[in-house]
Amino acid sequence: LLHCAEAQKTYSDLLLKQIPENAKSILDVGSGSGNTAKKLIDRGNIVECISPSSFLSEEIEKKLGSMVTIYKTLFEKLETDNTYDLILFSESFQYVPIKKSLEKCYKLLNSNGYILICDFFQKDPSHFTELRGGHSFPRFQNVIQSLKFKEISNIDVTEQTAPTIQILDDFLTQFGGPLKSLTNFYLENRYPMFSKLLKWKYRKRIKKLNRIYFSGQLTAQEFMEQKTYRFMLYQKQ
């Protein structure tokens, strides 16, 4: 857990360093619980958040109150007359459609505004991997190059990010596995009929979860082979 906290701090510090000084108004897409938004506000930025999750929106409101405007919607469904100096996707770009979202960014950005994308992508989407998630990086590059955006920086942090995946795998192996076995033992002994029905109904999902999270395949090496993690800054032209 200590390593995870250190990794999160390193991530946040690098993210903040990528934001140009002249970018004052920021739209934070997929704001989580509002930690990044708080750091941005603390350094003097004007921040608006997009959070389709009611639970997370409430967490942001508790943390930031009237200091931030929250849009409880998906980015592609956002309706606003406001424009921004920078639109931030911190591990949220993988959840939005590429072309539609980039075109929307262009409309929402002020003249010479920026997009900052911090996320992982698939190197080769045709190659099957249990490590799902992330858009095709070749497709993303093709789309953004077809639009009026100039690449300012493109930092590959895949190698630095991979150890976090290994920490997760170690945690699941050392703690998740035994906890899963203990839960199974409890259910089978206390509620045998319910346990059998549960395993039958969700047998495919359980098999998939075991294959992904408890097979030892969720490794740093696998991540580096299949994914590329980028901090990318683009400017509207």
Task: Provide a role label for each language-model segment.
Residues 5-22:
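Conserved alpha-helix/loop element of class I SAM-dependent methyltransferases that forms part
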Residues 27-77:
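Class I SAM-dependent methyltransferase SAM/SAH-binding core
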Residues 77-87:
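A short acidic, Gly/Pro-enriched loop at the edge of an enzyme's catalytic core
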Residues 86-98:
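A short SAM/SAH-binding and catalytic strip from SAM-dependent methyltransferases
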Residues 128-218:
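Substrate-binding/catalytic lobe of Class I Rossmann-like enzymes that use SAM or dcSAM, i.e.
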Residues 170-180, 224-237:
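Core SAM-dependent methyltransferase catalytic element
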